Amino acid sequence: VHTHRSFRNPPALPHAAVVETLERALRDRSFEGEVADTLVGTALNDDDHAFVEHWCVEVGTRAEPGSPLLGLAGLCLGHTARRFGRLGDEAVKLAESLASRAEADPADVDGRAMDGFDDVRSFLGLWPSQD
């Protein structure tokens, strides 16, 4: 029997459900597993730019060192930059910081943060000049 695996992007959830899930995981690491679909679905499918950016920044600043939520937040900032074509200064600085931390110590922040920062630089035109 051949099994076909399928991939689907998670849907955006109502804001109240997003806030509840993210706050619970930020208070108690045992709930971190619930966050991936919630944050990715929000970053990919929620049309409220301010809400999406706010929660990517919240997760990226409040998650503990070594938490997989840090790399996820960086990745989702990249999705947000791609979708909306803009990020606030705090979000850009956070994406850069998370990527730097991932490069320095992947046990602190996983490599998804570097992918996210690449997207931020690409979609916001922030690549360093090649003088």
Short names for language-model regions:
Residues 34-51:
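A contiguous binding-surface segment within folded domains or other stable secondary-structure elements
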Residues 30, 64-65, 105:
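Structural signature of alpha-solenoid helical repeat scaffolds
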Residues 1-37, 130-131:
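N-terminal "cap/leader" segments of large eukaryotic alpha-helical scaffolds
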Residues 36-40, 74, 114:
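Hydrophobic core positions within HEAT/HEAT-like alpha-solenoid repeats
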Residues 43, 78-79, 118-121:
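Structural signature of alpha-helical solenoid repeat scaffolds
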Residues 2-3, 92, 97-131:
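Eukaryotic acidic, Ser/Thr-rich intrinsically disordered low-complexity regions
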Residues 15-23, 47-60, 83-99, 126-130:
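Amphipathic alpha-helical scaffolding segments comprising HEAT/armadillo-like alpha-solenoid repeats
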Residues 32-36, 70, 110:
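Residue-level detector of extended alpha-helical repeat arrays and alpha-solenoid scaffolds
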